[in-house]
Structure formats: C-alpha cells, structure tokens
Amino acid sequence: MCRRMDSTLPAPAKLLGPAGLIPFASLAAGVWAGWPSAAWALAAYGATTLAFLGAVHWGLAMRAPSSERGADWWRLGLGVMPALLAWLALILPLSVGLGLLALAILGTAAVETLATRAGLLPEEYLRLRWILSSAAAACLVAGLAGL
C-alpha cells in the first residue's frame, strides 16, 4: 500500500495557482472583446497548462520511494497523456481544440481524484486542483462561446 502524502501545500502554490488563472480570464475576455489573436493565445495557454499538469506526475514518479514503483507506469502514463492531448488540441480547429482542452483539464483532475484516494497525491493539492481546473475550463468554454 502506498504511504499517504503530506497534505500541506507550500504557501507559494496557494498564491501562484490562482495567479495562473489570470491569463485564462484575460484571454477569454479578449475573445469576447474581438481581439483577433485571443482565441489562439487562450488555446496555447490552455495547452501549456495541460502539459504542465502532466509533468507533475513525472516529478512524483521520479521521487517516489521504491515501495511505490508499481505505480510508475500509471504515473508516467498520466504524465504523458495531457501533453499529447494538448498537442492534439493545437492542431485541431480552434473551436474543437478549446473544447478538448476544457475536457482534458477536467479529466486530468478526475483521474487525480483516484490518485489521491490511492495516497499518491496530497488531498489539499486535489482541492486546489479542482478549483483551478474548474475555473480554467470555464474560461476555455467562455472563449469557445465567444468565437
């Protein structure tokens, strides 16, 4: 059985995470304001964010104790899938890509719920992730609606 991770998040994560929503909200507003590049910039930022979410799992797998090595394939697979979906979202038509990014960001949070239940992620991280993921997905959908 995996050991439970410390559930305390570093203070910077509690500030920098919400700050990461500023570009999402600004770019979604830019789409509605008619800024020509805003939708593409929103998709690019969403893809970058989604790839980052996957990278979290690579970091966890690299520092996991040997007793947790059985989770390596699961963690590393979860680390790769968001980047692949982000890339796909950028080569699809913008209207499809924005929707895919919103779903993938929420989907990654859903999978992380399972990881948290298995003790692979701290519970406080998951709470913050759902708040941030929901807000990011809402901004992506708002941008999509503004096309």
Residue ranges and their predicted role:
Residues 88-107:
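Transmembrane helix-loop-helix
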